[in-house]
């Protein structure tokens, strides 16, 4: 059972991710952002270094009240933390309906206001109607902690959802795909 090996851990000096079935470490301070999580079958426990990279970049660039788009949300960890850090609203999408269910449940556990959080199942790369239903020129920050083979085609369409001047943060790219991803991102602006 994988749950017995997953314990609370610090993402950085201010964020702790805690499995819903575990207790907080005794040294947790009042100013710590505690994120409770049960990924179920969805990807995203927060332990992977690519998730930590996205969280670090989100903390660096997200401004209070901004709109956040989490593409390939898995457990919802990135968008949930974004809302806890002050995003005004967040959209999270995944092609896996189980991930969407996990993200909604994790939002509930973390007392996220569902008027600020929308989670949908669908493919924004191939389904133009779905992509536009997620919001055209709406988001200040887009996060995609997914495989390079998804980021490459995503780079050609995600601008539809981004405000002018918005930032796109991606992670999950293996070294052998780094140049391909860079080329796609540069080619697609």
Report the location of each language-model feature.
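N-terminal auxiliary segments of SAM/dcSAM-dependent transferases
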Residues: 1-28
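Hydrophobic residues in well-ordered beta-strands that form the structural core
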Residues: 18-19, 92, 170
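S-adenosylmethionine
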Residues: 95-189
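Surface-exposed loop/turn positions
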Residues: 13-15, 66, 166
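Conserved SAM/SAH cofactor-binding pocket of Class I
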Residues: 41, 45-123
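A short, charged helix-loop
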Residues: 29-39
